[in-house]
UniProtKB/Swiss-Prot annotation:
The lineage of its organism: Bacteria, Pseudomonadati, Pseudomonadota, Gammaproteobacteria, Pasteurellales. One of its GO terms (biological process) is lipopolysaccharide transport. The gene is lptD. This is LPS-assembly protein LptD. NCBIfam families: PRK03761.1. Its main location: membrane. It is found in: Cell outer membrane. Together with LptE, is involved in the assembly of lipopolysaccharide (LPS) at the surface of the outer membrane. It comes from the Bacteria. GO terms for cellular component: cell outer membrane; transporter complex. Residues 1-24 form the signal peptide. Keywords: Cell outer membrane, Membrane, Signal.
Length: 782
């Protein structure tokens, strides 16, 4: 019997959680509990409209006064007042005839903005200024209610004394603010409060002599709700944001953060929008880190971030992306919205460009800040000038001409590394041919590069050739076709077969004399080249290396193809691609076998996307090394997404030790094992009030978790609380290769809801983006 009772109780709970009413939209539920304006909205100045009075009885004293009793109703435009008794008088004043209405014994007032119930009211009918005693009020078509000892209604504001305000629905007193004086600004949509006390279920929590709160969707300056919690890394922490609405196009957020193990950190963000662009400037500053590992280091820890994008004078574009931190471990020690330790580096880029229909020119500078401890970092390009020219139908022929040219100066902080100027021109002519059966593109290209190299400043710096010329011609023939058939295993569906064949030729030239031989994981080859990751789409690239300092020889065929399946409405539901490169000669950049391709063919590369139905999607890619006869790289993602942010995602990625070693440069630290990681992400709105996000990434090779996160949110019409617990791999200085450290943290965030018209949305999206391995949408078919 006891077991059956538990069963019935469980069924009752589940029925409540998943009932139709509980799954209704939270915003609709909340707004259903507030009054709505149902009449026809009358525009214009209400003071110019006539006044209508109805009552059971009326006594008139000629043109001096009038008394109305019994179901009195006074209406002017959208304004309506109901009472049992009303007295109206008029007097001559220097500025004209003044009419006054006095209501006693209780009344109800409403317009398209507010509803009132009070004991006594006095209304100046000329100006409609209204003074009320002992009233309850409720905003119309939005949340917000309260009471006041006296209320003065004016055209632009409401002034209340000994007032109470809350956005909670009637019969819910979860939170409220009591103030000695409160002024609600109607047009600006904010409330000022003096001598305010914030209460939770009637219990005072804190007092402030002055407070501002938004009562609409307009941005307002003031304190935002805090975040607080605890972690192994920071200890107890508390951060209090303050928002400053400087102007319609300028605002700032300043957030002091206290960490019991580290001290005070000041964070700030400034946003701007101007006729010539928009941007964001941010900073984070900790004067001295009190953590044991940094206590004896007399230096600050800080971050500076600036992004700017603008278009001006019609043809000009300016872009700036700059992030710099005080030390390599900054993003390992601090959570920041402006970077992550998993990025590996911070960008510092500037670019200004001028565009015309057939050409463009750009001047830029870029450098990178590496987060790992390295003796030799990457080069910076300062300055860099790019010029591009395009001309289709050259001389009224079917030929297209394109020119890419670049001049760049490379510099390195290490005195061991050479400096260089690189001058590059890359003209190409292609002949595109196409018909309904397919397309053929024949392209010829010339790589012409000149280097002027200078030996490093250090005495032990290696010698380099001062002047180098490299000229490499290239020929590429690309053939594609599309074959379609409606004879598929699903009636009404269409399947295509799209073969793709490419031949590429480029002669060999030894390029080991370009740049330094002191390569490492971040320097790559030469000045800005590194081996590109290979996948199916990379099979048809012209080059194996990024940048221009390593252009590998090529004498190869690439053979691949894609099949697609379309449903009855013409929407793509499935695709599968497979391909491989066949080398007629080894692809080389120098005489080192380590930098050459092996065998007569590349790995098989496969890629696929499958929209199983409107809820289920699958994506995957795979590479099989034919030389080693084993898998080299693979990943897949399976996701169930029935509605909105309700998500269940399973992901897996694999990289063999040989693949990793082959794609890292010679001085990089070699991996001792394969990478095998399995991830599970769940985000679900259980009801309109409860939502959960859970994430677990497991390293199958190490048999240890990489990151774990559990977030739970409870929302009501007027408040919400979000609790998140995270455990993730972190690092410490001088740790050994076998050591693994975890940071454990718990964060709590509380929000007031119902102050704006559209602030009932949950924080599932925010919770999905938290952590070092955030949720990614990996699908091309939607």
């Amino acid at each position: 019997m006891k077991k059956n009772s538990y069963t019935r109780l469980s069924i009752a709970i589940l029925s409540t959680l998943y009932s139709v009413s509980s799954l209704a939209d939270l915003k609709s539920q909340c707004l259903a509990g507030v009054p709505h304006f149902t009449g026809e909205l009358i525009t214009g100045n209400p003071n110019d409209l006539p006044v209508y009075i109805e009552a059971d009885q009326a006594r008139l004293n000629q043109s001096v006064s009038a008394s109305y009793e019994g179901n009195v109703e006074i209406q002017q435009g959208n304004r309506q007042l109901r009472a049992q008794r009303a007295d109206i008088s008029q007097q001559k004043q220097p500025n004209g005839l003044q009419r006054l209405a006095h209501v006693r014994g209780g009344f109800e007032y409403q317009d398209h903005q507010i509803q009132l119930k009070g004991e006594e009211a006095q209304v100046q009918l000329n100006t409609k200024n209204t003074d009320i005693k002992n009233a309850d009020y409720q905003l119309v078509d939005r949340q917000g209610r309260g009471k006041a000892e006296s209320i003065a209604l004016r055209e632009d504001y409401r002034l209340m004394t000994n007032a109470v305000f809350t956005s909670c629905l009637p019969q819910d007193n979860a939170w409220s603010i009591e103030a000695k004086e409160m002024r609600q600004h109607i047009q600006e949509e904010y409330a000022e409060m003096w001598h305010a006390r914030f209460k939770v279920h009637g219990v005072p929590i804190f007092y402030t002599p002055y407070l501002q709160l938004p009562i609409g969707d307009r941005r307002r300056s003031g304190l935002l709700l805090p975040n607080f919690g605890t972690s192994n890394r920071d200890g107890y922490f508390y951060e209090q944001p303050f928002y400053w609405n400087i102007a319609p196009n300028l605002d700032a957020t300043m957030t002091p953060k206290y960490m019991s193990k580290r001290g005070w950190q000041l964070n700030g963000e400034f946003r701007y929008l101007s006729p010539i662009g928009e941007g964001k400037i941010a900073g984070e500053y900790l004067k001295q880190d009190r953590l044991t590992d940094y206590r004896n280091r007399d230096r600050s820890r800080h971050l500076f971030y600036w992004t700017h994008h603008s278009s001006f004078l019609q043809n000009w574009r300016l872009n700036l992306d700059y992030t710099r931190v005080s030390d390599q471990r900054y993003f390992s020690d601090f959570d920041s919205a402006y970077g992550s330790s998993t990025d590996g580096y911070a960008d510092q880029k500037f670019r200004v460009a001028y565009y015309q229909p057939h050409y463009n020119i750009a001047i830029s500078a870029k450098q990178f800040q590496i987060f790992n401890e390295v003796d030799i970092g990457p080069y910076r390009a300062l300055p860099q000038v790019d010029f591009n020219y395009y001309q289709n139908a050259l001389f009224d022929s079917p030929l297209n001409f394109k020119l890419f040219s670049q001049v760049v100066h490379f510099d390195n902080k290490s005195p061991l590394m050479p400096k260089a100027w690189r001058f590059h021109a890359e003209p190409s002519i292609n002949l595109p041919l196409s018909n309904r059966y397919g397309s053929l593109n024949i392209e010829t290209k010339l790589y012409a590069t000149h280097y002027q190299q200078t030996q490093g400043r250090a005495a032990e710096a290696e010698q380099v050739e001062r002047k180098i010329n490299r000229v490499l011609p290239q020929v590429k023939v690309d053939l594609q076709t599309v074959l379609a058939s409606q004879q598929t295993f699903i009636e009404g569906y269409t399947q295509t077969l799209e073969p793709h064949v490419q031949y590429l030729y480029r002669p060999y030239k030894d390029q080991s004399n370009i740049g330094s031989k002191l390569n490492n994981a971040y320097l790559g080859f030469g000045y800005d080249s590194s081996l590109l990751q290979q996948d199916y789409f990379g099979l048809f690239r012209d080059r194996r290396y990024s940048g221009l300092d390593r252009i590998a020889s090529a004498n190869q065929f690439t053979v691949g193809g894609t099949t697609r399946i379309y449903d009855k409405k013409g929407n793509e539901r499935f695709n599968f691609s497979a391909g491989q490169i066949y080398y007629l000669q080894d692809s080389r950049i120098d005489n080192s076998k380590e930098n050459s391709t092996y065998g007569r063919s590349s790995s098989w590369s496969l890629a696929s996307n499958w929209k199983i139905n409107d809820q289920w999607r699958w994506q995957g890619s795979y590479q099989y090394d034919t030389r080693l006869n084993k898998s080299s790289l693979g990943n897949f993602t399976l996701e169930y997404n029935p509605t909105g942010n309700n998500i269940i995602q399973l992901s897996y990625r694999y990289a063999s030790q040989q693949y990793i070693d082959q794609n890292l440069t010679s001085a990089a630290n070699r991996y001792g094992q394969d990478i095998k990681q399995l991830g599970l992400t769940v985000a679900w709105a259980l009801t309109d009030q409860w939502a959960v996000v859970a994430r677990h990434y497991q390293d199958l090779a190490l048999r240890k978790p990489v990151e774990q996160y559990l977030g739970l949110e409870y929302s009501t019409c007027c408040w919400a609380i979000n609790v998140g617990a995270r455990r993730s791999v972190t690092s410490k200085e001088n740790q050994t290769a076998n050591q693994i450290f975890y940071d454990k943290s718990i964060g709590i965030n509380i929000e007031l809801r119902g102050l704006g018209r559209d602030d009932h949305k949950g924080n599932i999206e925010k919770m999905l983006q938290r952590g070092k391995l955030p949720y990614l949408q990996a699908f091309s078919l939607y």
